[in-house]
Swiss-Prot record:
Catalyzes the last two sequential reactions in the de novo biosynthetic pathway for UDP-N-acetylglucosamine (UDP-GlcNAc). The C-terminal domain catalyzes the transfer of acetyl group from acetyl coenzyme A to glucosamine-1-phosphate (GlcN-1-P) to produce N-acetylglucosamine-1-phosphate (GlcNAc-1-P), which is converted into UDP-GlcNAc by the transfer of uridine 5-monophosphate (from uridine 5-triphosphate), a reaction catalyzed by the N-terminal domain. Binds 1 Mg(2+) ion per subunit. One of its GO terms (molecular function) is glucosamine-1-phosphate N-acetyltransferase activity. The active site is at 362 (proton acceptor). In the N-terminal section; belongs to the N-acetylglucosamine-1-phosphate uridyltransferase family. In the C-terminal section; belongs to the transferase hexapeptide repeat family. It comes from the Bacteria. The lineage of its organism: Bacteria, Bacillati, Bacillota, Bacilli, Bacillales. It comes from Staphylococcus aureus (strain USA300). This is Bifunctional protein GlmU. It is an enzyme of class 2 (transferase). Signal peptide: none annotated. It is found in: Cytoplasm. Its cofactor is Mg(2+). Pfam families: Hexapep, NTP_transferase.
Length: 450
């Protein structure tokens, strides 16, 4: 059976009090609507139509060709929004799910189960519901004496008795597609809001003797919509908790989950330890037996087995097996560290390749460079890679020793097994097996201060 989805993403989001389009506010580093799209796609849907309005081009820019789009010029209610997908879906057979673009916590598993329940019951419509302690603001599920759905009533149209009901509509539905578009034309706006409500489609189906099901989820967090910054922070916290829980169940030690942020696209191997205050974002891959020290930040990087990152920042970089970074080091984009490398305190590496066993232990800047195997870079060494207009490369061979407080003025190549004396400013290439000294000779005048 063909399956389709409509994502409702046309609302203004005035309560966000933001210049940014509502569904583009981020949870766990991704726009809310992107989380929804990924869950919808993961549930086995063949075609997605996103209903856009305010900020349409921004939404299209984020989702790209993963969705079709329909424009809702006036926001006249959820049924009106769904009807905007008519040109794409009206003639389609199969099941269509309708999901709100501001529900970033909905999972593909719940959508899969909703669809399965709907199709197994041969229903014309199914609503995803939940029971919550504070149902204010949600449509209520009104059941008849036999426990079947009688109608869904919106908060502003509900009687006090209906407001006391704690089973609510999530705003997520599954429909027989043909039935959906047939009934949408019959929906009226004679309600307190003067809007065309999508739940009225269910009442129309019931009035015709059709089958309408309710599937109740036990995970209330999943259906939480985000309408303001407070709810945005709650969704962020819930996503953080879910992600950390997943990693811990898969063998990762997270010492303080409440202070640890791990993005949804991060992968972490078993027996890795994440200390408090850590942030790991983007498409980061972390191996096994790694230690990520407290207050480290890692973005879009690869950390191989056995590495240790101590209170450092790693951006768009790779760290080899058993390599130690920090404390207080910064790996900038293009930093590539081999195995058993040491990058110590207050060292900055940018667009540089440090081969296996290389050491840069303290207070250095290494940029646009290649450092050979087992080479030691002394404290305070700087690659002078920029002349104000262009960047130049520094190459240091294997098994070399560069003393403290050395300036390597690029472009320059230092060979293998070279010793560069402390305090030197190297401007010329140095061949293999050489000693390079480039500093003024010391002059001492005894008794000068008497």
């Amino acid at each position: 059976m063909r399956r389709h989805a409509i994502i409702l993403a046309a609302g203004k989001g005035t309560r966000m009090k933001s210049k940014k389009y509502k569904v583009l506010h981020e949870v766990a580093g991704k726009p809310m609507v992107e989380h929804v799209l990924e869950s919808v796609k993961g549930s086995g849907v063949d075609q997605v139509v996103t209903i856009v309005g305010h900020g349409a081009e921004s939404v299209k820019g984020h989702l790209g060709e993963r969705s079709l789009y329909s424009f809702q010029e006036e926001q006249l209610g959820t049924a009106h929004a769904v009807q905007m997908a008519k040109s794409h879906l009206e003639d389609k057979e199969g099941t269509t799910i309708v999901v709100c673009g501001d529900t970033p916590l909905i999972t593909k598993e719940t959508l899969e189960t909703l669809i399965a329940h709907h199709e197994d019951a041969n229903a014309q419509a199914t609503v995803l519901s939940a029971s919550i302690q504070q149902p204010y603001g949600y449509g209520r599920i009104v059941r008849n004496a036999s426990g079947r759905l009688e109608r869904i009533v919106e908060e502003k149209d509900a009687t006090q008795a209906e407001k006391d009901i704690n089973e609510i509509s999530s705003g997520i539905f599954a429909f027989n597609n043909k039935t959906l578009f047939e009934k949408l034309t019959q929906v009226k706006n004679d309600n307190a809001q003067g809007e065309y409500y999508l739940p009225d489609v269910l009442s129309l189906i019931l009035n015709d003797g059709g089958i309408v099901e309710v599937y109740r989820t036990n995970d209330v967090e999943e259906i939480m919509g985000v309408n303001d910054r407070v709810m945005l922070s709650q969704a962020e916290k819930a996503m953080q908790r879910r992600t950390n829980h997943y990693h811990m169940l898969n063998g990762v030690t997270i010492i303080d989950p409440d202070s640890t942020y791990i993005g949804p696209d991060v992968t972490i191997g078993s027996d890795t330890v994440i200390e408090p205050g850590v942030r790991i974002n983007g498409r980061t891959e972390i191996g096994e037996d790694v230690v990520i020290g407290q207050y480290s930040e890692i973005n879009n990087s690869t950390i191989e087995n056995g590495a240790c990152i101590q209170q450092s920042v790693v951006n768009d970089a790779s760290v080899g097996a058993n390599t130690k970074v920090g404390p207080f080091a910064q790996l900038r984009p293009g930093a590539q560290l081999g195995a058993d490398v040491k990058v110590g305190n207050f060292v900055e590496i940018k667009k540089a390749d440090l081969k296996d066993g290389a050491k840069v232990s303290h207070l250095s800047y290494i940029g646009d460079a290649v450092i050979g195997e087992r080479t030691n870079i002394g404290c305070g060494t700087i690659t002078v890679n920029y002349d104000g207009e262009n960047k130049f490369k520094t190459i240091v061979g294997k098994d070399s020793f560069v003393g403290c407080n050395v300036n390597l003025v690029a472009p320059v190549t230092i060979g293998d097994d070279v010793l560069v004396a402390a305090g030197s400013t190297i401007t010329d290439d140095v061949p293999n097996d050489s000693l390079a000294v480039a500093r003024a000779r010391q002059t001492t005048k005894e008794g000068y201060r008497k």
